[in-house]
Amino acid sequence: MFPAGPPSHSLLRLPLLQLLLLVVQAVGRGLGRASPAGGPLEDVVIERYHIPRACPREVQMGDFVRYHYNGTFEDGKKFDSSYDRNTLVAIVVGVGRLITGMDRGLMGMCVNERRRLIVPPHLGYGSIGLAGLIPPDATLYFDVVLLDVWNKEDTVQVSTLLRPPHCPRMVQDGDFVRYHYNGTLLDGTSFDTSYSKGGTYDTYVGSGWLIKGMDQGLLGMCPGERRKIIIPPFLAYGEKGYGTVIPPQASLVFHVLLIDVHNPKDAVQLETLELPPGCVRRAGAGDFMRYHYNGSLMDGTLFDSSYSRNHTYNTYIGQGYIIPGMDQGLQGACMGERRRITIPPHLAYGENGTGDKIPGSAVLIFNVHVIDFHNPADVVEIRTLSRPSETCNETTKLGDFVRYHYNCSLLDGTQLFTSHDYGAPQEATLGANKVIEGLDTGLQGMCVGERRQLIVPPHLAHGESGARGVPGSAVLLFEVELVSREDGLPTGYLFVWHKDPPANLFEDMDLNKDGEVPPEEFSTFIKAQVSEGKGRLMPGQDPEKTIGDMFQNQDRNQDGKITVDELKLKSDEDEERVHEEL
């Protein structure tokens, strides 16, 4: 694109071409015709030997035209040619600046039309001729091609070739635009194109950076719209033209594709595409968010997508880790929300752009799906879904052995795990670090038969690294139902009595009274204590294995039997250990 040039008011200098065709009007007999008897011509003879298919306008009286011609006599001898001077004729038609025959011969012509004109002497240079060039009473033959036509009353002509169905905004004065264009003269001669430069033409509209006609022609355009803009020379480069590519007094034709538009005063634009019901929390500065996105330019060109990487984009918002426009655009979003975020370049990558996919001064459009977000200060969110109808006197606490069913999913509904796949409830001892901290917390204080929903932030789940099947930094949603609970055992205990242990423990355990207790007697004694309700084993473990571990602990010398000296209660061992430490 060429810059706007200063207006020109210099007088038109007439070359020899115009001097030949100037106001030398013979005394004629008006609009006559060729003599039927083959005598002298009474009027101009016009042969239209090439007529273009499209003719949007025809030359009228008072129009300014630019044309090439060859002038010859009847014998074919050339007396003048604009081609020889490589200079078009540029002149007003019908105001006496041309010989009458040429004035009449140009009327009704279309751009790119070719005509042969036969001008009789009385409509040419008459009985006087033009000294040294045109003899008296000469009939003149002209071969003319019209290249341009305009009128001082013309305005910019705008034709919309393609308009997108959705138009988020239209160009106004003061906006900054990026567009592609092809520039031609009215006869189709190309003089410039942005496509050959490998980038759009970027400029402000209505600020004097463009020729006046282009300033006007871009107004009201939508991103993605295609226009044809015809600009008369007095709204383009006027009498001086531009360099060697745009001649003086040339009408210009631009085919324009608007890529994007913004204003330096623009803020981030938000459009909610889908809002899930029951949004109880919106993202704020300092939250950590996981989201999917498609990023495109204003014309729809995709430059990036998290979906192509099969991984969410994970970041803190409102803390400068992402471009300012995205930082702003993500705040206030709900989990599961889909929104469109339009970011002007001064809140994105500015005048320089980034990489080879985001050009300078580009407006960016992100279609975002918020998967989840959390704050490092978040705790487990607990919501009771249902409670048993009967009175609940005992609830779960640290150390309890619990059985529960659960479904675990991401906040977008993606199911990860369920206990129903295993055909039995999950088992855990609360506070024993056997489940993630958030689930451990959420299972406490429950009644048997109660159902809860737990929202567990990642720092109380699987953290930034995630786990098998669990993405990093994922917030987890659990639905849990408590099936049963049992009081647990103190840490380090495999068996406890409900009351005091027997006073003569070894004698009671030595069933055959031989002074030693083999594994069979030990197992029989412990099982009897459990069945009689005098004691209980660690819940959730295989009783045989637990009893075997207890026997191994008491068989100090590992000889396969327990003696009275070896048998000690854990409480006695703990007291001895404390005494030794003291």
From Swiss-Prot:
It holds the Pfam family EF-hand_5. Residues 1-26 form the signal peptide. It is found in: Endoplasmic reticulum lumen. The gene is FKBP10. Keywords: Calcium, Disease variant, Endoplasmic reticulum, Glycoprotein, Isomerase, Metal-binding, Osteogenesis imperfecta, Phosphoprotein, Repeat, Rotamase, Signal. InterPro entries: EF-hand-dom_pair, EF_Hand_1_Ca_BS, EF_hand_dom, FKBP-like_isomerase, PPIase_dom_sf, PPIase_FKBP_dom. This is Peptidyl-prolyl cis-trans isomerase FKBP10. Glycans are attached at residues 70, 182, 294, 310, 352, 393, 407. The keyword Calcium applies. Ca(2+) 1 binds at residues 510, 512, 514, 516, 521. Residues 497-532, 542-577 form the EF-hand domain. One of its GO terms (cellular component) is endoplasmic reticulum. Its main location: endoplasmic reticulum. PANTHER family: PEPTIDYL-PROLYL CIS-TRANS ISOMERASE FKBP10, PEPTIDYLPROLYL ISOMERASE. Its EC number is 5.2.1.8. PPIases accelerate the folding of proteins during protein synthesis.
